[in-house]
Amino acid sequence: MKGFLFLLLTISLLVMIQIQTGVLGNSTTPRMTTKKVKSATPALSSLGGGSVLLFLANTLIQLFYLS
């Protein structure tokens, strides 16, 4: 059981890192626009998905550990 939880944590961390670096993100579309970006929100949008994934994986691991 502990091996499965470690594997789940490792996979979720790898996926989170790949989402943050843009490997699994939406990086295939060209980013050339004529509009100016007024805030840094689009640059931080991929970080939110990765941290949500890490939070859910951590919650699952804690629930399995407590049961």
Swiss-Prot record:
CC per GO annotation: plasma membrane; side of membrane; sperm midpiece
Instruction: Give me the glycosylation sites of this protein.
Output: N26
Q: Which residues form a coiled coil?
A: none
Q: What does this protein do?
A: May play a role in carrying and orienting carbohydrate, as well as having a more specific role.
Where does the signal peptide begin and end?
Answer: 1-25
Q: Which residues form the propeptide?
A: 46-67
Q: What is this protein called?
A: CAMPATH-1 antigen
Q: Does the keyword Amino-acid biosynthesis apply?
A: no
Tissue specificity field: Epididymis. Highest levels are found in the distal corpus and cauda. Little or no expression in the caput and proximal cauda regions.
Q: Which Pfam families match?
A: CD52
Lipid tethering residues (GPI-anchor amidated serine): S45
Which gene carries the instructions for this protein?
CD52
Q: Which domain of life is it from?
A: Eukaryota
UniProt keyword annotation of DNA damage present = no
The entry's keywords: Cell membrane, Glycoprotein, GPI-anchor, Lipoprotein, Membrane, Signal
Q: Where in the cell is it found?
A: Cell membrane
Per the UniProt entry, what are the Gene Ontology biological process annotations, in alphabetical order? positive regulation of cytosolic calcium ion concentration; response to bacterium
What is the first-listed, main subcellular location in coarse terms? membrane
Give the membrane topology, semicolon-separated if more than one. Answer: Lipid-anchor; GPI-anchor
